[in-house]
C-alpha cells in the first residue's frame, strides 16, 4: 500500500514539473502578479476591519483548490497533500504554484471531457441506460477520490446521468447525444479561454475571502463590469448574476430595472438559455462562463432579449419558461419611492393606510456635488410623499423596504430624521476601533404618526439601519421576516493591476447591536415568506460575526403595547389563509429535493422520479389556484410556461395587507392610536 501511495506522490511531482514547463507564466506576469498580491496583503493587514486575522499560506492553497474543484472531481486527496513539496517563501512562489495547479486542473479536465465524449458516443439505446448505480447531485461535502481511475470512472457515470436528464426531455437518443456533445464542446472552449488574469484572480480571492465575503480583488475587466453595474451605463436587464457549478443564477435585481419591473424574474432563478433577440435561436448557456452569458444578455436599448428561466428548486435539465425582457438603462426615476393608499375595513370604521414603496436608497450624487438645489434623492421624495399623505389624513403608514438592498448610507439617516427628528441613527466603527455616531443634532419629525416598517430577507444594509433605528427608538413596528444581515461598509482602492474592494467599517445600531450576520429581527413575523437559506449574510463563508458594543443616548417614543396580542391576532388571521399552506408545501418540497442527494443511473427509475416530481409541483400549484378561483393547470408544461408574476404579485400584496392589518390592530389596541409622542430619554 505504501508503494502505491509513494508512486502516486512521485507521479504528481513529475506532473507538476511537466505542467510548469508546458504552461509557463512569463517572468513579467509573475513579477506583476506577485507585486499586486503583496500590495493586497499589505492593505488588508493594515486596513481591513478584521486585520488581526491569521492563517497559513497552505490554507490559501487548499481553499484555491477547493474553489476550482469544489465538487472534488479532479484532484485526489494525495495530490492535494503533495503541494507541500514546494516551500512557499514568497508571493512569487504562491503565484507560480497557483498557475501550476490550475494548469494541472485544466489538462486533467480536458482529458476527462474526452473520455466523457467517448462514453456518450457508445450510447445507442435505452438499454445502455440501465444500471443499479447512482451519482450524487452534490459532492462538495463528500471525501475526495483516492485515485485517478476512481475519478475517471465517476466522471463517466456523471455524464451518463446528465445524458439521462436530457434524454427524458428530448425523448430521442440522437437529439440528446447532439445536445450533450455540444455542451461538452462548450466546456472545453471555456477552459481554453480562461486568461492569466482570471487564474490570478481565483488565487488572490482565495486569500481575500478569508477576511470576509465582501473583500475581493477585481481584474481590470471585472472592475469595468462592476462600474457598469454600479452606474447602469450599459443597456441590459438590470440583474446581477453569478455562476454556480456551471449554472447562471440571479443574485440581485436592480430596483427600477427591466427585470425587476417585468416581474418575470426573482432572486435565485436560474438562466439556462439566452436568445439575443426574438429572431435569434435560443442558446443553451449551461456550463458557459458568466462573462459570456452577460455579453449575450446585454445589447442595444429597446431591443428584446429572450431568456429560458428555471426556478431555484428545479432540476437543471428541466425545460424552463421562455420570457422576453426589453433591454434598457436603469433610470433613477424608475427606482424612485412610490405611494398609494389602501383601506382596512373594521366593524367600527374604515382605516386609511398610506403605503410608501422604497426599492433603494438613491441619490443623484452628481447633481448634489454640483450644488443643484433640485437634486433627486430618496429622502427628498419620501418627505414630499409624507406631506401628500398627511394631507389625505391617513391613519397610519407602512414603509415597504422589501427587496431594498441598500444604497447611500447618507440617505439612511436622512430618512430616519423624517420619522424621529433629531438624534443618533447609527454608530460606525473603523478597523482601528475608533467609533463615530451619525445622526442629526437639529431637526423635527416630518411624520409623527403610527408607522410599520415592512422587511424581508432581501432588505439589507441601509434598509437595516433604518429598520433598526425605528425599532430601537420604539418609534414603530418592524414586520415581515429576518433581514439580510449586511452590517459592513466597503472601500475600493487601485492596485498596480486591478482594484481591491475591502471591508473597513462595521456599523452598529444605537442600542449597540450589530446588524451584521444577524440582521434585524421583526417584532412580528408574517409567515407568507419562503425561507430560502441561500439568501442572507449567514449563507456566506467567512462572513464577519454578529457582536454588540455599548449603546449611545437615544430618545424612546411610546412603545407599542400588547405585542403578544398583536402576534396572536395576526397568527389567527394568517393561519386561516391558504397562502400559509401554499408556502409550507413549497418549503417542504424544496427541503425534500435538497435532502435527496442521490440520482439513480437507471432511465426507468429516473422517468418515474420525473413524473412524481412534476405531479407534486402541479398539485401544490393547483391547490392554491383552486383557492383563488383560478383555472387549474392541465399539465406540468402549462405550469412552466405560465406567468410567475400572477402569484408573486398576489403574495406580495397579501403580505402588505397583513402588515396594514397589524397596524390597524395596534391602533385599536392602544389608547392613543393617532399620534405617538416623545417619551423619556434612555440610554
Per-region residue spans from a language model:
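Polar, glycine-rich mid-to-C-terminal structural blocks
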Residues: 462, 474, 485-535
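PDZ/PDZ-like domain segments forming the peptide/carboxylate-binding groove
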Residues: 66-67, 87, 98, 102-114, ...
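Cleft-lining beta-strand/loop regions that shape enzyme active-site pockets
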Residues: 19, 25-28, 42-57, 192, ...
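Charged, amphipathic alpha-helical regulatory modules used
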Residues: 19-126, 130
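Conserved functional hotspot residues or short segments at active or partner-binding sites
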Residues: 60, 149, 167-182, 515-683
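Extended, domain-scale alpha-helical bundle/helix-rich regions
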Residues: 115-236, 242-245
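Solvent-exposed, polar/charged alpha-helical surfaces in well-ordered, non-transmembrane soluble domains
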Residues: 34-38, 42, 58-66, 103, ...
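Sec-dependent N-terminal signal peptides
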Residues: 4-13
Amino acid at each position: 500500500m505504501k508503494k502505491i501511495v509513494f508512486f502516486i506522490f512521485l507521479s504528481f511531482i513529475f506532473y507538476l514539473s511537466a505542467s510548469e514547463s508546458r504552461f509557463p507564466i512569463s517572468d513579467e506576469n509573475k513579477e506583476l502578479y506577485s507585486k499586486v498580491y503583496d500590495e493586497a496583503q499589505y492593505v488588508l493587514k493594515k486596513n481591513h476591519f478584521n486585520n488581526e486575522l491569521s492563517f497559513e499560506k497552505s490554507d490559501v492553497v487548499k481553499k484555491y483548490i477547493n474553489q476550482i474543484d469544489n465538487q472534488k472531481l479532479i484532484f485526489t486527496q494525495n495530490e492535494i497533500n503533495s503541494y507541500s513539496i514546494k516551500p512557499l517563501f514568497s508571493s512569487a512562489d504562491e503565484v507560480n504554484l497557483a498557475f501550476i495547479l490550475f494548469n494541472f486542473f485544466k489538462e486533467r479536465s480536458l482529458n476527462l471531457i474526452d473520455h466523457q465524449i467517448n462514453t456518450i458516443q457508445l450510447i445507442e439505446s435505452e438499454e445502455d441506460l440501465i444500471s443499479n448505480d447512482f451519482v450524487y447531485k452534490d459532492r462538495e461535502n463528500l471525501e475526495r477520490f483516492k485515485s485517478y481511475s476512481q475519478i475517471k470512472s465517476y466522471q463517466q457515470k456523471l455524464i451518463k446521468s446528465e445524458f439521462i436528464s436530457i434524454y427524458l426531455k428530448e425523448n430521442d437518443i440522437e437529439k440528446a447525444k447532439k445536445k450533450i456533445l455540444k455542451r461538452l464542446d462548450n466546456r472545453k472552449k471555456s477552459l481554453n479561454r480562461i486568461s492569466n488574469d482570471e487564474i490570478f484572480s481565483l488565487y488572490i480571492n482565495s486569500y481575500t475571502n478569508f477576511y470576509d465575503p465582501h473583500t475581493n480583488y477585481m481584474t481590470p475587466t471585472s472592475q469595468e463590469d462592476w462600474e457598469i453595474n454600479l452606474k447602469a451605463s450599459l443597456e441590459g436587464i438590470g440583474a446581477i448574476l453569478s455562476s454556480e457549478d456551471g449554472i447562471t443564477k440571479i443574485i440581485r435585481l436592480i430596483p427600477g430595472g427591466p427585470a425587476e419591473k417585468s416581474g418575470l424574474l426573482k432572486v435565485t432563478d436560474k438562466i439556462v438559455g439566452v436568445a439575443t433577440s426574438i429572431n435569434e435561436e435560443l442558446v443553451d448557456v449551461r456550463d458557459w462562463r458568466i462573462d459570456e452569458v452577460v455579453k449575450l444578455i446585454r445589447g442595444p436599448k429597446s431591443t428584446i432579449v429572450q431568456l429560458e428561466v428555471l426556478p431555484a428548486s428545479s432540476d437543471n435539465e428541466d425545460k424552463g419558461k421562455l420570457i422576453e425582457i426589453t433591454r434598457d438603462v436603469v433610470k433613477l426615476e424608475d427606482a424612485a419611492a412610490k405611494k398609494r393608499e389602501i383601506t382596512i375595513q373594521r366593524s367600527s370604521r374604515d382605516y386609511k393606510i398610506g403605503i410608501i414603496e422604497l426599492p433603494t436608497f438613491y441619490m443623484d450624487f452628481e447633481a448634489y456635488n454640483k450644488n443643484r438645489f433640485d437634486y433627486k434623492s430618496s429622502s427628498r421624495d419620501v418627505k414630499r410623499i409624507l406631506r401628500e399623505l398627511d394631507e389625505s389624513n391617513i391613519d397610519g403608514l407602512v414603509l415597504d423596504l422589501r427587496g431594498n438592498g441598500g444604497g447611500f448610507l447618507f440617505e439612511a439617516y436622512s430618512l430616519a430624521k423624517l420619522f424621529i427628528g433629531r438624534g443618533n441613527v447609527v454608530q460606525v466603527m473603523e478597523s482601528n476601533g475608533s467609533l463615530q455616531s451619525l445622526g442629526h443634532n437639529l431637526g423635527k419629525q416630518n411624520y409623527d404618526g403610527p408607522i410599520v416598517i415592512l422587511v424581508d430577507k432581501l432588505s439589507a444594509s441601509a434598509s437595516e439601519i433604518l429598520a433598526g433605528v425605528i425599532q430601537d427608538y420604539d418609534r414603530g413596528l418592524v414586520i415581515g421576516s429576518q433581514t439580510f444581515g449586511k452590517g459592513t461598509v466597503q472601500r475600493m482602492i487601485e492596485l498596480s493591476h486591478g482594484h481591491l474592494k475591502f471591508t473597513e467599517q462595521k456599523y452598529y445600531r444605537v442600542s449597540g447591536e450589530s446588524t451584521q450576520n444577524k440582521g434585524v429581527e421583526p417584532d412580528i413575523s408574517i409567515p407568507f415568506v419562503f425561507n430560502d437559506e441561500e439568501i442572507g449574510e449567514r449563507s456566506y463563508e467567512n462572513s464577519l460575526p454578529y457582536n454588540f458594543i455599548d449603546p449611545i443616548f437615544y430618545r424612546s417614543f411610546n412603545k407599542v403595547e400588547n405585542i403578544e396580542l398583536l402576534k396572536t391576532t395576526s397568527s389567527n388571521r394568517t393561519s386561516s389563509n391558504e397562502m400559509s399552506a401554499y408556502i409550507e408545501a413549497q418549503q417542504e418540497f424544496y427541503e425534500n429535493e435538497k435532502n435527496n442527494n442521490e440520482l439513480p443511473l437507471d432511465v426507468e427509475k429516473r422517468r418515474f422520479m420525473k413524473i412524481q416530481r412534476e405531479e407534486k409541483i402541479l398539485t401544490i400549484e393547483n391547490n392554491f389556484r383552486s383557492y383563488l378561483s383560478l383555472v387549474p393547470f392541465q399539465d406540468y408544461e402549462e405550469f412552466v410556461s405560465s406567468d410567475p408574476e400572477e402569484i408573486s404579485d398576489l403574495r406580495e400584496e397579501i403580505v402588505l395587507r397583513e402588515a396594514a392589518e397589524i397596524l390597524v390592530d395596534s391602533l385599536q389596541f392602544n389608547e392613543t392610536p393617532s399620534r405617538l409622542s416623545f417619551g423619556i430619554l434612555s440610554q
